[in-house]
Amino acid sequence: MISQERLLKVILAPHISEKSTVCAENDNTVVFRVAIDATKAEVKAAVAQLFEVEVDSVRTLVNKGKTKRTGARMGRRVDWKKAYVTLADGAEIDFVGAE
C-alpha cells in the first residue's frame, strides 16, 4: 500500500506539448511530469486516486538534462521523468475545469 503523502508527491505537473496534445486526442493518453524516483505502480495509483479515473497502462522515460553554458562555466540542467498514462475507454481528465 502506497501512503497518501507519497501519492501526492509523485505527480508534479501535466506536460503540455504538441506530442502530448496529439496523444490526448487520438490515444486517450495523458502526459505528466513525475518525481524522478517514482515507479509505474505509484504513477498509476496516484492518477487513479487524484483524478478518479481508471488507468490502463503507464509508460515512463527519463529525460537527461542538457549541458548548457552559463557565462564562462558549463552547467547542467536537472534530469526529469515523464509518464505517458493511458486511460480506460470512456475516462478522461479535464485540466481546464470548464463546463
UniProtKB/Swiss-Prot annotation:
Q: Which Gene3D superfamilies match?
A: 3.30.70.330
Q: GO terms for biological process?
A: translation
Lineage of source species: Bacteria, Pseudomonadati, Pseudomonadota, Gammaproteobacteria, Alteromonadales
Is Metal-binding given among the entry's keywords?
Answer: no
Spell out the HAMAP family in the cross-references: Ribosomal_uL23_B
Q: What is known about what this protein does?
A: One of the early assembly proteins it binds 23S rRNA. One of the proteins that surrounds the polypeptide exit tunnel on the outside of the ribosome. Forms the main docking site for trigger factor binding to the ribosome.
Name of the protein this chain belongs to: Large ribosomal subunit protein uL23
Cite a single GO MF annotation: structural constituent of ribosome
The gene coding this protein = rplW
Task: Report the domain of life of the source organism.
Answer: Bacteria
Quaternary state and interactors: Part of the 50S ribosomal subunit. Contacts protein L29, and trigger factor when it is bound to the ribosome.
Instruction: Give the family this protein belongs to, as stated in its UniProt record.
Output: Belongs to the universal ribosomal protein uL23 family.
**The entry's keywords:** Ribonucleoprotein, Ribosomal protein, RNA-binding, rRNA-binding
One GO term of the cellular component aspect? ribosome
